[in-house]
Regions:
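Short, Lys/Arg-enriched N-terminal segments with co-localized hydrophobic residues
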Residues: 1-8
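Residues that flank catalytic or metal-binding motifs in active/ligand-binding sites
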Residues: 11, 56-58, 82
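Short loop/turn microsegments at loop-to-beta-strand junctions
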Residues: 14, 57, 111-113
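Short aromatic/hydrophobic contact patches that present stacked aromatics
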Residues: 14-16, 59, 85-87
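Core segments of cupin and vicinal oxygen chelate
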Residues: 17-66
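Vicinal oxygen chelate
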Residues: 19, 23, 33, 64-68, ...
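Gly/Ser-enriched beta-turn/beta-hairpin loop segments
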Residues: 53, 77-78
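A short, polar/charged loop-to-alpha-helix boundary motif
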Residues: 130-147
């Protein structure tokens, strides 16, 4: 193990993300992009194994906006999809643009309705809090005539 601040595995719920071989790079990108985010542990292979060698990074523990995550370098077997995404609530247009541009500008791709994917294929929803507040409030209820 190269680095260990503390482990996320003490949390009751940790998001586990599968990467081909770039879990450490992705974790460092997330830690550098979002506040309250950091890499907390990097675990290396103790010896050679099928498809890898001693010292290869196997897992990386990190947080994204305080949410504990672990990235696994599991090879190309599984890919990320829109079935899972991080939804990031933003408080200003500047914050929305900053996160969007960081993700898309680092090899990611744009999608519709505030969705984008990072260069590792993980989906993100960069959502202005004003939008989610308005959706939660709903439209005014129509008045219904009372019945006798």
């Amino acid at each position: 193990m190269i680095y260990k601040e503390h482990t996320n595995m003490k949390s009751k719920n940790t998001i586990c993300l599968w990467f081909d071989k770039d879990a450490q790079e992705a974790a460092r990108f997330y830690a550098g992009t979002f506040p309250d985010s950091k890499v907390t542990a990097i675990h290396q292979a103790p010896g050679d194994y099928p498809g890898g060698k001693k010292g290869d990074v196997l897992t990386v523990e990190f947080t994204v906006l305080g949410i504990p995550c672990v990235g696994i370098n599991g090879g190309p077997t599984f890919r990320h999809s829109e079935a899972f995404s991080f939804q990031i609530a933003t408080d200003s247009q500047e914050e929305t643009d900053r996160y969007w541009n960081a993700i898309v500008g680092n090899g990611g791709e744009e999608s519709a309705c505030g969705w984008c994917k990072d260069r590792w294929g993980l989906s993100w929803q960069i959502t202005p809090r004003a939008l989610t507040d308005a959706m939660a409030a709903g439209a005014p209820r129509p008045s219904v005539p009372s019945t006798p």
